[in-house]
Amino acid sequence: MEETIRKGSEVEVSSTEEGFADAWFRGILQENPTKSGRKKLRVRYLTLLNDDALSPLIENIEPRFIRPVPPENEYNGIVLEEGTVVDADHKDGWWTGVIIKKLENGKFWVYYDSPPDIIEFERNQLRPHLRWSGWKWLRPDIQELDKSMFSSGTMAEVSTIVDKAEVAWFPAMIIKEIEVDGEKKFIVKDCNKHLSFSGDEARTNSTIDSSRVRPTPPPFPVEKYELMDRVEVFRGSVWRQGLVRGVLDHNCYMVCLVVTKEEPVVKHSDLRPCKVWEDGVWQDGPKQTPVIETPSNVMKTKPMRSCSGAKSMTPKRTTKHARRSLNLEKSAETLTKAESRAATGELRSKRANDVINDNTPLVITPQVKPIASVEPVTPSRVRTATPLKQTKADTQGKSSPKKTLEPMRDENGLENSTRQKVLEEKNSEKKGRKRKRQEEHNSDLKETDESCNGQMAEINDTSSICNDVDDQPLAAWINLPTETSIDHSPIVVNNAAIATDVEERQANDTLMILPFAKKSPFWKMYETQEVCKIAPQSPHFSPLFEAKEELREWTAVGMMVSFYGLLEEVKNLQLDVSPSTLGSLSCSFAELEKHGFDVAAPQSRINKMLSLQDERAKKAEERKGLEKKIEAGEIEGHTYEEEMAELELKILELKRQQVVAKEMKEATDKVTSGMKSYAEMINQEIEDLRLEFQSTASAPW
């Protein structure tokens, strides 16, 4: 070494400092080496600066870490190939590694063992590595590379979690296989980032379990994807599972992501068939099973026919069991489901499922007017009557805009106070007209049937039906159960909502009077609305007696519109609806209930929504707590991984220092052994000189 480097010579310096092992930095030697080689030499670096970043770094280095600059002629004839040990010009120094792959573009992948990493370099950034023995340069042998499935530099895919729910795969490069606590792990580099470095760009690799690694799928050429093909989409730097939902122009597809249900438009090049790595073999991914509509998963709803659009469904015969006695005891025995359905001709057409079905009893109430006087259907379930001050006697027994108020008998045969008052106002012509009802029945029924359905209803055995059944409106014959009010308007019965209410209604079927006359055309339009047929209402509007007379009907109309509007609003509620909105809707329905609206169903639905929202809020809070714990656990796990990586690096450094110390010890022992031999030789020479001296001194004169 003394013959090759001197003060002022350009040298290369290495170090055992963590993070700088196997790296050589250029510098200028500022003092001559000593003969003993034990004194540290001062070196001024050419590429490293002090902490102030202004002046060159100067250090005192042990001679064993200093070597001459390799001469250019030593590189002649060396071809860089896979397995060649090289030095790479990187971060102001020459870093020693091994070429693991030569790319077609003339670039090279270089593997470093401490710390483990793989970096891509240009050819002009590399030089063959030479080792200085102290008096000459030595070339390392070509290293044999591992060619296993997950060897260093192999492209693979690593699983990750996207949106906290979906398992996706991102391309990665295997850096090194390691073993931690007896478990096999891999150090990988995300290949979505550039492998080349520029400036002070810093990147960290990841240490992952072997279960999260799979080989890169081989190319599965697909000329064109079909609808519902299960594919993988390269989106957001990862491969995610999806289904082809649309084939577009320009070789593009609309794909539905399986987990998030997003439907992005992607190019053909960003798709590949869905494959699964199982038992060391690529298998086809799970197929999409088409959903088959069955009676269990498809809601079937039969629309109701309005009176004007329904076909004639009048039964061809009636039964004697259709008779209803106005006596309470007899009616309690005879009014059963079978008898009620027999009275309607055993019709089987159903209304919407949530309103009425075949098992719902149909209630038939006594009628007091000829069927010829039936007016358009009104939405009230209770009987209505024109206020007394608007009545006028109808002496001819024919339909007129103003009907004479006629009382209605109770189910038990008694008369209430209203009946008493009305009977006092009736005249003899009224009684005569009532006796003529049976004779006028057939012609009146024909007239009403033609006006409602446009067809002639066939009526048989009408003589076997009691007067109350004969006077039913035609809507009852087309499976639209009704009652007829005192003013001859058929009224839809909401018997689906209260099936157990039949006996009570039979016992307490008293006359109820609306606080207004139905003059508005709204009531006719109301009948044709589908929602009104699905959820019919019969409010009594009794609180409106306290309102001004001219405001009563329009207030009632507003309430009807508000009720069905609120029903629609409840139906369209979304998951993010606020509890205050639900509370406001509940209060609105409670206010409508005071006017006789049946709000049990919407109130029950609102209460259930509030309960579900409370439960959802609790689950969300529970999930939030778990997410925090998971995040804390992941951070703690990463901390342990970093600590283990640091310990591994320290172990590697200690092993390297051990090797260096062993080499130094062997060299020192060799020198010491030589010096001992030389010392013995000198001792022998000294002894010889002593003997010669004595011989000389004792020689005779």
Swiss-Prot record:
Pfam families: Agenet, DUF724. The keyword Transport applies. SMART domains: Agenet. Residues 514-700 form the DUF724 domain. One of its GO terms (cellular component) is nucleus. Keywords: Coiled coil, Growth regulation, Nucleus, Transport. Residues 381-399 have a biased composition (Polar residues). Its main location: nucleus. Residues 299-353, 374-452 are annotated as: Disordered. Expressed in roots, stems and flowers. Residues 626-670 form a coiled coil. This is DUF724 domain-containing protein 6. It comes from Arabidopsis thaliana.
